[in-house]
Amino acid sequence: MSKKVALAYSGGLDTSICIPLLKEEYGYDEVITVAVDVGQPKEDVAQAEEKAKKISDKHFTLDVREEFVNDYIFPLIRANGDYEGYVMGTSIARPLIAKKVVEIAEQEGAVALAHGCTGKGNDQLRFEAVFRLTDMDVIAPMREMNLTREWEIEYAKEHGIPVGVTTAKPWSVDENIWSRSIEGGKLEDPGYIPPEEIYKWTTAPEDAPDAQIIEIGFENGVPVSLDGQKMGGVELIEKMNIIAGTHGVGRTDMIEDRVLGLKARENYEHPAATVLLAAHKDLEKLVLTRAELKFKATVDAQWSELAYYGLVDEPLYDDLNAFIDKTQERVAGTVTMKLYKGSVLVLARTSPYALYSEELVSFDGTSIDQKDAEGFAKYHGFQARLYRKFVVKN
């Protein structure tokens, strides 16, 4: 009986050389490649499929864009997903990709699961958090063989595997509908200024056109319309990436704390994510109480950490989502924003659940008798006065 292994396949250098390695070094008879479409460019998906069919024994391409948006990105928006300023496009996609690889492995009778992640990054942990929910063996050639990028490039050439990187320009790109990450090579030097050529989604802010006003509509905490036109999540995010990217919105160059404790220099593009997260957070301020906002900020931070680590099967992750889902019942309305040369500015917001009262807050309003605040003011900071009087004095 053939000894099969299912490989999470992207079409890139790492996963491509895993195919011969799994046979030559690990003794598998059949390598089944699984490419999961979470919004990569169509040409990348097609090229990965074409390459896999030439060098693997069996290949599957799965289009899960709708599932990715509805079950992963929308919960991220509702949770104001953010890890140290990173919108977690790669992080949130990995568990879904891993689950699809497991499904194919079980369908095809594979005895092992493999990925092309290194031993220094986060993705190995995200994939394996899902893979190890099964009883199948888990193989990580890059980590286990301690391979370098230069060695991989030469190995690929020896095996006739085309690669899209060179030793002169060895950065790697990971892309889905929510974000595009660029890392490796000279970019690993935090003192190196990235060349403009690494950016594909965003216009350089100084070259961006004049300002554009847009309106995002929300229901139950998720975006449902753009400029008054209802549309599905995939279409909305794709359009927003183009619009915001044209205005130079959504570039991040950051030092990121990886799960293992290493600090890494990361470059990201995420136009739609920047706009939609800013709009959602602003709308929440209009409809949620101060107590809800304060507590939800803590919940959001914990949610984001679990998502970044790839721990979406943790019971706590479900618990946090239950609370977040309840708060989002009132997060509905519209947010008007201005996009201008790399910046996003909220101009206006409306909601049928707004807790804002223009009459009550106005300096000219008479609904509240200002004298009623006198008693409250007398005892505001009361404990501090007692401390200063009886403790500091002595």
From Swiss-Prot:
Enzyme class: ligase
Cellular localization per UniProt: Cytoplasm
EC number(s) reported in the record: 6.3.4.5
Species annotation: Methanococcoides burtonii (strain DSM 6242 / NBRC 107633 / OCM 468 / ACE-M)
Quaternary structure and partners: Homotetramer.
GO molecular function, one term: ATP binding
Binding residues annotated for L-aspartate, in chain numbering: 118, 122-123
Recorded family membership: Belongs to the argininosuccinate synthase family. Type 1 subfamily.
Assigned GO CC terms: cytoplasm
Signal peptide feature range: none
Keyword annotations of the record: Amino-acid biosynthesis, Arginine biosynthesis, ATP-binding, Cytoplasm, Ligase, Nucleotide-binding
Name listed for the protein in its UniProt record: Argininosuccinate synthase
